[in-house]
Amino acid sequence: MKYQHIIDYLIQTAGPSIEDAGLSDERVNKRTEAGLCKSFRRYICGVEGDEDCDYFKVDEEGMLYVFNGQYYELMLEETLLELIIEVMEKKNVGIVYQTGSAKIVRDYCLNRLKGDERCKFVPNRQYICFKNGVFDLGTMKLNQFDLKYKTDIILDFDYVADAKSALWDKVLGMTVPDENMRETFHQYCGCFLASRTEYKIEYILFVVGEGQNGKSIICKAVVNMLGPNVASSYSPEQLFKSSQMEYHLADVNGKIVNYCDEVSNKDFSGGDFKQFVSGGAFTGRHPYSKRPTKVDKIPLMLCCANKIPPTTDDTEGYFRR
């Protein structure tokens, strides 16, 4: 089972206090039900100072995350319900509680997770999770997987310190012949992994050239390597000029790069553009949500274009970016 380690964790921790609870009951006893709620909450929500019980978190949007042994991943609330039922079954909890109380237990735990600041999932992008460990950008070392490394940058390949790619060097050299420009491209892509709360990065990168010159190939190679969880693909017009821009801004929040494969020949300059490139906050909105959401985790912009788009903004601030 995918979450067997979570089931094992709950059996080892909450298990002893719920074993055989209400085994012979023919109807739900509220006192027994309350005891189940308390036992599960202790180890799903944890307590102050007990870092070993930090398996479950909730983000600012109320989405549930669970530590899967390597990193924190999204979990459906229905999946948590299934895990609680399975733990109850394995610990011989009465059947009336498995069918009648498991959802109450689940909701009791979720309410605490969502209401307790200690349970908030706050990713630290000093850490990057690879398949073979967690890389610390502060120490530049690879560490073993651990609950303490809370990150949302998950890369589906191994970290190899001295890895080289002759094919990448060849294609990049053909596409960007100038060595200084290649170094600039490398540096900008490296900035995707930098925390914008620690470093002030106020640039957009245009890879400019005629069609079929390889610019999309090198950009897509980088973006596809990072994966859709941290990379979005909206055009500047969709982000700064569209009537749907609030939805698009909400969607890019938390990404590390927004890539546009083909920038149109339209002017998208202005205050919103400069604010975005500087990492300034916006107000966005998720589809079907009645409440606006703060957009303050702004990605860097990487764009391909046949030529630099026109602008009506002749300020120093625009050209500096």
Q: What does each model-found stretch correspond to?
A:
Residues 247-253, 285-304:
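AAA+/SF3 P-loop NTPase mechanochemical coupling elements
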Residues 234-244, 271-292:
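Substrate-gripping "pore-loop 1 plus following alpha2 helix"
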Residues 33-41, 223-226, 267-283:
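A short, contiguous, amphipathic alpha-helix enriched in charged residues
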Residues 1-153:
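Intein modules and their embedded homing endonuclease domains
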Residues 255-279, 311-318:
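Conserved AAA+/SF3 P-loop NTPase catalytic/coupling segment centered on the Walker-B
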Residues 295-298, 314-321:
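Phosphate-sensing "switch" segment of ASCE/P-loop ATPases
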Residues 124-132, 297-310:
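Catalytic nucleotidyl-transfer cores of nucleotide-processing enzymes
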Residues 52-78, 121, 134-254:
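P-loop NTPase catalytic core of nucleic-acid-dependent motor ATPases
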